[in-house]
Amino acid sequence: TNIEPDHIGPNEHGSFEEYMRCKGMLFRQCRVGIANRDDSHWEQVMEGHTCRLETYGLSEEADLRAEGMRLTNRNGHLGVAFQVKGLMDFDAEIAMPGRFSVYNALTAIAICRHFGVPVEAVKKALREARVKGRIELVKVSDEFTLLIDYAHNAMALESLLTTLKEYDHGRLVCVFGCGGNRSRLRRYEMGEVSGRLADLTVITSDNPRFEEPQAIIDDIKTGIGKTDGKYIEICDRKEAIAYAIDNGQ
């Protein structure tokens, strides 16, 4: 669906170039490849592919496209309605917000087409699909909306926060932390993203593994310090979540 510098470090890939080469190997070991044409790195990943290639995206050049996107809000469930064009032609709606959710939906639609899944079954599945921990609605108050999302790198966090701002729900509070024994660059970048896009960031501990939680938080603060964003530091995750709920509006 997309690829950005991630999973790079002493215990992961040596470089982004190596990461892309490894992803590209998948398209030399299959008969049909399905790729997001809108991703800026898609041609590099597909270089040397031996499979029959199909693309999807929002651009006119994609084989399978989403057009006419509009935001929806049904009882607190933020979503997107759009038309599927190109290789297929029907109206669709998903109960998850954002362009990234549309890209994920297009991936699923493209796969279903190859397996001959009826269009009505595809439409129903898209309307009803929910993913635990991915833009998951947690009902705690009628005064604000609380969502949980796994967004674990800067690209995912920026996509999420940008999407939520499009719904114009007012004040945006972001509670997050970063995992230990992973790239420190990720922490700086996520701090900068949240500081730039959220009205308030609550920095907390996530899964420190074998690092000191405070050291990870300090790295996040380095990133957020590059912005004018407001933030508060609460190391205990339960207390951080409680603070965000108590101060929600």
Please name every model-derived segment:
Residues T1, T55-G57, V193, T204-S205:
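Short linear Ser/Thr-Pro motifs
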Residues E12, T50, L87, T107-Q249:
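ATP-dependent carboxylate-amine ligase
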Residues N2-L146, K221-Y231:
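Acidic, Mg2+-coordinating active-site environments of NTP-dependent enzymes
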